[in-house]
Design a protein with these regions (language model features):
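Conserved Asp/Asn-Gly motif in the active-site loop of CheY-like receiver
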Residues: 35-39, 94
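C-terminal output helix
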Residues: 110-120
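Receiver (REC) domain active-site loop signature in two-component systems and cognate sites
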Residues: 59
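Short hydrophobic/Thr-rich beta-strand motif most characteristic of the beta2 strand and flanking loop
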Residues: 29-36, 44
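Short, glycine/charged-rich "phosphate-handling" switch motifs in NTP-dependent
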Residues: 103
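Conserved acidic segment of CheY-like receiver
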Residues: 5-16, 21-25, 53
């Protein structure tokens, strides 16, 4: 996707975290969609079909691991890459997240450069959806 604008869904139950991530993503030139828990994130992804989802892990109603697994198993959303964004930094959490279908895992707090690098890596490795 390179420097092209992407539609990115940010899913986080913390208003301050959501705003902080939103500011970085907007500064990188992308369009923002938001949801405040895992269940709302799944619904937003199905309705809006974003180019990518930045998903917090610890949330009410459906945690980020569960929401990621739901998106990965749904025919309409399985092509959407999910990056887990969390304070959970154990290797076991990272491995579990990747097994649920996440394409990358970034721990909070992170810099604009770190997020930009992860977004670029995920977008450059993404295959175009097949019809």
């Amino acid at each position: 996707m390179g420097n092209n604008m992407a539609r990115i869904l940010i899913v986080d139950d913390s208003p301050s975290q959501l705003l902080g991530i939103q500011r970085i993503v907007e500064k990188l030139g992308h369009e923002i969609l938001t949801a405040t828990d895992g269940a709302a994130g799944v619904e937003a992804a199905k309705a809006q079909l974003p180019d990518l989802v930045l998903m917090d892990v610890v949330m009410p109603n459906l945690n980020g691991f569960q929401a990621t697994r739901t998106l990965a198993r749904d025919a309409s959303t399985k092509h959407i890459p999910v990056i887990l964004v969390t304070t959970k930094d154990q290797d076991t959490d990272r491995m579990w997240g990747m097994r649920q279908g996440a394409k990358a895992y970034i721990t909070k707090p992170f810099s604009e450069d770190e997020l930009s690098e992860v977004l670029e890596r995920v977008f450059s490795s993404q295959e175009p959806p097949t019809a």
